[in-house]
Amino acid sequence: MLKNIYFKATLLSIVLLLISCDKDDTPEAENEMEVLNKTVIVVTNLSDDSSETYNFEVEEHDHGQDHSVLPQTQDDDEHGDHTVIELKSGSEYKFEISFLNDTDPNNIIDMTLEVINEKDEHHVHYELAGNGIEIESYSGDTIDSNGNALNLVTKWTTSTSAEIEVEAYLIHQPTSKTGNTRDDFGGSTDVEIEFEAHVE
């Protein structure tokens, strides 16, 4: 009788061990907290505090890979392949960029806080194909432990009329936080969006 009980207990332990191993070998589902599939830019004219919100739906998210973007303004007004942000010459604007996970429309997660918490591992870079706009970190921006601005909040100063293509990147683990082009920063790309800035 005791031998039988001992055998059953041993068999049960083996079964539980095998089940545990199977669970460990099963790949974990993608963590929803790592998904960044929507970017929002709020543009505020510093002279009168008027603002406009621009939404960019990112179709795919994959470190270091190209992915498609569907740009939309607040009124779903699309201009060709790019969203157009209208700016006045000789003016100053505040650009606030945020990153969301809207996989579940009923539970939209603001991922910007996670980016801030990992500020040493992230950097926002705007690459402009043209002249007429100067960009700098602005009040309310996040500064990393080395004194580098994250560029979540920036001031755009316009000068002359221009139509400028803009690419905005959220860079993960950049090797440098200074540069003029995306390649200067190294690391991988968490998010990439495109729009046109029209200065008139």
Where are these regions (language model features)?
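Intrinsic disorder/low-structure terminal segments
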Residues: M1, Y6, T53-N55
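Bacterial Sec-dependent N-terminal signal peptides
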Residues: L2-N4, I14-I41
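Low-complexity, glycine/proline/serine-enriched flexible coil segments
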Residues: A9-L11
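First exposed extracellular module after export/assembly in secreted or surface-exposed proteins
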Residues: E30-E200
